[in-house]
Structures are given as C-alpha cells and as structure tokens.
C-alpha cells in the first residue's frame, strides 16, 4: 500500500508489521494516496 508522509512529502511503502512511521523523517502521520482511476457517473 502506498502512502505519503505529511511532513517530508515522500512516498512510503508500508509492510504489514513494519509499524506506521516514515522511514525518512520518523513522522507518524501518513496520508493514503488516492487512486488515479477516472470514474464515470451518469447524470439525469
């Protein structure tokens, strides 16, 4: 799963048992990346 650190803005890959912490700066707030899929919605 891909996350982005809220402090240093780097992409972080987390393992299941690695803990929730940025390996670069040690910050504990990680933001989940949004999917890049485009969704179509029909409007009536």
From Swiss-Prot:
Gene Ontology MF term list: DNA binding; DNA-directed RNA polymerase activity; zinc ion binding
Entry EC number(s): 2.7.7.6
GO cellular component, one term: DNA-directed RNA polymerase complex
Free-text cofactor note: Binds 1 zinc ion.
Secretion signal, residue range per the UniProt entry: none
GO biological process, one term: DNA-templated transcription
Cofactor: Zn(2+)
Family note: Belongs to the archaeal Rpo12/eukaryotic RPC10 RNA polymerase subunit family.
Amino acids binding Zn(2+): 8, 22, 25
Organism encoding this protein: Halobacterium salinarum (strain ATCC 700922 / JCM 11081 / NRC-1) (Halobacterium halobium)
Top-level taxon in the UniProt lineage: Archaea
InterPro entries (UniProt xref): RNAP_P/RPABC4, RPABC4/Spt4, Rpo12
Substrates-to-products reaction catalysed: RNA(n) + a ribonucleoside 5'-triphosphate = RNA(n+1) + diphosphate
Subunit annotation: Part of the RNA polymerase complex.
Cell location: Cytoplasm
Name under which the protein is recorded: DNA-directed RNA polymerase subunit Rpo12
Free-text function comment from the UniProt entry: DNA-dependent RNA polymerase (RNAP) catalyzes the transcription of DNA into RNA using the four ribonucleoside triphosphates as substrates.
Keywords: Cytoplasm, DNA-directed RNA polymerase, Metal-binding, Nucleotidyltransferase, Transcription, Transferase, Zinc
């Amino acid at each position: 799963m891909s996350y982005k650190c809220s402090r240093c803005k780097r992409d972080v890959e987390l393992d299941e048992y690695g803990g929730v912490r940025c390996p670069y700066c040690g910050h504990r707030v990680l933001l989940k990346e949004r999917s890049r899929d485009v969704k179509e919605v029909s409007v009536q």
